[in-house]
């Protein structure tokens, strides 16, 4: 989510780049921590997680992830200085990305620490993905970073929309970052003073920076008694409107209350994730705790790629009616009275029965392939065009949204596993598979709730192709058919006699 965005790469906190570039840019993108440690032996400079400094101290590094899978902790222990620094990434639906930091004195002597910690290369809101990928230096010229001294909240924006046309083009949203837990820190908006800090020079607060990559770095003095710790948080969010930014600024007038609200929001997300995984039978108890955790992790990864059926076998009539309307407006108009008269929620079998009573094969086709799926949020390396998706969990009003997107191979692999927990949807997955296949036996490379997608071939790009293949067809369909026969032995024979299936129409022929 930090680089792939909360919805899409256009709404990322850090640049969405290939994994090799993520490793190469570790020194100037993402988390950064510099420490000047005063002990009885003198002043020591320590930069956690900087491998170029491995020869300076004896250190141990650890990476932890909670069992739920939604928190990741980076830890470095300096055995020479008897100090430990760790930070944990977690997420809040209301506040965005939360970076919880802890600095611990493991020794038996007091230490004084000059801390500089924060985030580098923060993307402003509304940064176009294509411009950031192909013209990042140009994007830098548009960057405007500003600090609100009263609350310590920084705004990362574009001075204007990025365009080369003689017309007004405003950019009115901001990425925001603020700090909780440190007493009156000095705040930097870019990385220019890092080298000065390394040389022991004092830090000067920055109120406005233009035309450079944004950063949010806090400088504070920590006094740690033996065995004591200091904790703080950096909280970052993207695509904040003017109203949202003003409201956040107002809330930061009571920082303790904000910290408590963030904790509640994170815990609420934990509970929601646990319930989602539980609905797909992700929790089990065995004599081997690691086996149970491994099963849970497999279930989470499956759901992250394929999604989850939203409310067991309950279906939203409004969402189903909207799906019919988006696929076939004429069909929707023919059955608008029936669709609008449906209960707000009904069981999927009840819906299928009502649809059959209409004696309309087109409506029956759309009804059978309807999948009320949400939550799936797969992203991958951006060098693969089929890995880029918009993961929409809410609509423009903030209401829950049923939506899914995935490349063909991944989505049907994961739906296959999902149907073991939701066997009444097996035939719907089969219908989606068959109806999205082409007459010549191939499949499009991406499938979404709105339909199918295929790649537009670029003759000058040897990696580009038409974007659909047939190599995954037979085995996937065979397994789905076997599952149907296992759970519903009579259903396949009935489906073969019904004229409710179709071929996908794509602008290519093999």
How would you describe each model-predicted region?
Residues 1-510:
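Anionic coordination/interaction segments
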């Amino acid at each position: 989510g930090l680089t792939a965005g909360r919805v899409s790469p256009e709404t990322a906190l850090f640049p969405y780049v290939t994994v090799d570039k993520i490793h190469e840019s570790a020194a100037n993108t993402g988390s950064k921590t510099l420490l000047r440690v005063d002990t009885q032996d003198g002043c020591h400079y320590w930069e956690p997680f900087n491998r170029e400094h491995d020869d300076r101290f004896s250190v141990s590094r650890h990476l932890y992830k909670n069992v739920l899978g939604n928190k990741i902790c980076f830890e470095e222990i300096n055995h020479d200085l008897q100090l430990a620094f760790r930070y944990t990434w977690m997420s809040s639906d209301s506040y965005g990305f939360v970076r919880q930091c802890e600095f611990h004195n493991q020794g038996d002597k007091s230490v004084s620490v000059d801390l500089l910690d924060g985030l580098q290369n923060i993307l402003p809101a509304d940064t176009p993905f294509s411009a950031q990928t192909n013209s990042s230096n140009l994007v830098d010229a548009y960057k405007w970073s500003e600090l609100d001294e009263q609350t310590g909240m920084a705004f990362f924006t574009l001075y204007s929309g990025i365009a080369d046309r003689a017309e007004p083009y405003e950019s009115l949203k901001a990425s925001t970052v603020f700090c909780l837990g440190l007493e009156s820190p000095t705040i930097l908006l870019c990385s220019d003073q890092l080298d000065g800090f390394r040389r022991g020079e004092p830090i000067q607060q920055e109120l406005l920076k233009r035309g450079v990559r944004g950063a949010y770095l806090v400088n504070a003095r920590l006094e740690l008694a033996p065995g004591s710790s200091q904790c703080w948080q950096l909280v970052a969010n993207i695509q904040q409107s003017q109203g949202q930014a003003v409201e956040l600024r107002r809330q930061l007038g009571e920082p303790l209350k904000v910290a408590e609200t963030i904790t509640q929001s994170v815990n609420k997300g934990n509970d929601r994730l646990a319930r989602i995984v539980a609905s797909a039978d992700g929790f089990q108890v065995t004599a081997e705790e690691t086996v149970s955790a491994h099963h849970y992790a497999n279930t989470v990864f499956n759901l992250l790629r394929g999604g989850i059926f939203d409310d067991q076998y309950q279906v939203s009539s409004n969402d189903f009616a909207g799906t019919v309307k988006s696929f076939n407006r004429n069909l929707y108009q023919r059955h608008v009275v029936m669709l609008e008269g449906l209960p707000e929620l009904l069981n999927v079998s009840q819906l299928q029965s009502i649809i059959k009573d209409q004696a309309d094969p087109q409506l029956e086709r759309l009804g059978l392939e309807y999948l009320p799926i949400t939550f799936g949020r797969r992203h991958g390396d951006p060098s693969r065009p089929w890995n880029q998706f918009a993961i929409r969990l809410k609509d423009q009003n903030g209401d829950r949204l049923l939506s899914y997107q995935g490349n063909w191979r991944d989505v049907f692999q994961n739906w296959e596993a999902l149907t073991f927990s939701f066997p009444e949807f097996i035939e719907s997955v089969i219908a989606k598979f068959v109806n999205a296949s082409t007459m010549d036996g191939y499949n499009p490379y991406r499938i979404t709730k709105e339909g199918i997608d295929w790649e537009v071939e670029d003759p000058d790009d040897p990696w580009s192709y038409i974007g659909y293949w047939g190599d995954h067809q037979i085995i996937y369909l065979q397994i789905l058919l076997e599952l149907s026969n296992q759970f519903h032995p009579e259903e396949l024979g009935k489906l073969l006699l019904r004229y409710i299936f179709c071929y996908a129409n794509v602008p290519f022929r093999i």
